[in-house]
Amino acid sequence: LFMKYQGIYFMKKTLIALAVAASAAISGSAMAWTPNGNGGSVQLSGMLTPDVKVTPWEVKVGDAVKGLDAKINKGQKTVDIAVTKTIPILGIRTQATKAFKGRDGITPQIDYHGAINISAFSDNATTLTLDVMDAETSKKIGKLEAIFSAGAIGSMHARTLAGHRAVHATRVGDGFFGGVSKEPKGVNSDAVKALLPELIPDVADNFDSQGVRMEKDAHTIKFSTIGNTYSAYYASGVRAGQNLEVMLDSPASGDTPIKWKASLPVTVTYM
C-alpha cells in the first residue's frame, strides 16, 4: 500500500514538473534567480490589428496631373496656366446601387487641410490655394490659386417623409462636411446635377433617388437615423476652361525653366 501511494506521489510530482516546463516554453523563457544579479528588462509585446470600419461608401482620388506648362517672361512673378482637361480631385459614392440603412459612424467628413474655404462657396465653387514648390528641391517658391468646384446630392426615405436634394454642410457631423458649401446660398441646385459627373464621370452611377424627384433647395444630410434609407454622391475638381494662377515669391530670372509642383492632401473620415 505504501509503495502504491509513493508511486502516486512521484507521478503527481512528475506531472507538476512537466506542467511548469510547458508553461515556461509557452511564455518564451523561464524566470530564473541570478546570483549577484544586476537587474534587466521585462519585454512586453503583442499585435494591434487595425479595426477596419465598414461603410456603404467607396472613394476615388484623382491621379497625378502632369504637363501643366506655360511661358513666363524674365521679371514676371505671375502666370496663368490653362486647364484644358478637367482635373478630378475627389469622388465619393455608394458601393451598391440600392439605398442603404442609416446607422452611426458612416457619415463622410472631408478634409482638404486648409486648401479651400468652405465658407466662401458661390455657385458650387470656391478658391483652392496651394503652396508651389520647386520640383527638384521641394522648397517653397510661391503659391497657386484656382477655382475649385464641388458638390453633393443625396436622397433620404423615412416612414413619413422623403427627400432628394443638393447638399450643404453647416457643421461637423453633417454629410460631406469640409468638402461642400457651409451655407445653402453657396449651392446652385439647378447646376449641381450636371456638374458632378463632369468632375468625376462615373460618380452618379450607383445613386438611388428612391423614387423621389429632386427639389430646388439645398439641405444638410446625415446618414445616422436607424430606420431611414439613404443614397448620395460627392465630387470635386477643377473644371476644364479654368486657369491655374501661379504666383512666384521671386520674379523669374535666367534661362532655365522653373520646374514646379503642388500637392493637395485629401482625407476622408466617417462619423
List each language-model region with its residue ranges:
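Generic alpha-helical secondary structure signal
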Residues: 116, 211, 234-238
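N-terminal leader/presequence-like segments
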Residues: 1-32, 194-226
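Extreme N-terminal export signal peptides that direct proteins to the secretory pathway
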Residues: 1-165, 248-261, 271
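Short helix-loop boundary/capping segments
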Residues: 138-224
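Long, compositionally biased interface segments
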Residues: 220, 228-271
